[in-house]
Amino acid sequence: MMNSNLVPFDPYYKKRITYVWRGQQFAFDVAHTIFSSFQIDEGTDLLLRLIEPAFSEPQRILDVGCGCGVIGICLARRFPQADVTLVDKDLLAVRYARHNAELNATTNVTVLGSVGLSEAPPGPYDLIVSNIPAKIGDYAIEHEFILEPLRHLRPGGEYWFVVVSGLNHLIPRLGPRHNLRLKEIKKRAGHSVYRIIAPAATMPTGGL
């Protein structure tokens, strides 16, 4: 059930995007300056259609770089028993993700402003997800969006993420470099989806 009486709700509002996933309809209000404000990003859609975590009922989920909240909110609806946390460094994105969580009646969602995972509640998480930003530089991607999330996973937990094809020069090298259980789930024109499974005991350090 969605609350449809909140638009327009602030001066940055651009439009409402509808999205159907796993037979359910969602609505996302977006601002002009938020990522993918025209339609649901193809990478986000690909990730959501592929993600099948090993834990059938994850209890804690984290969406890193959530934007307007699409991935985390969809997963919150799919896993209503889970405590779902969304983080983003952009405070306007945080505002819209909070609004969209209310709009889609996902009461199990918490949205926080955070550079990387600096303000995220401590783990462990069963499932972490991200549509990794492409233009922050290889070093930031490797440390803030690959290694750091793994430190917050429970043993055997999973990190599912999507990247634009321009990052395929980097991501496959990180598996052997850091001894990660990294698997490319699907590649198609424009995007690739990967999964990393946290080891049963020790997390990778990935020291700076």
PLM feature segments, named:
Residues 30-39:
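Class I SAM-dependent methyltransferase Rossmann-like catalytic core
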Residues 1-21, 36:
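N-terminal auxiliary segments of SAM/dcSAM-dependent transferases
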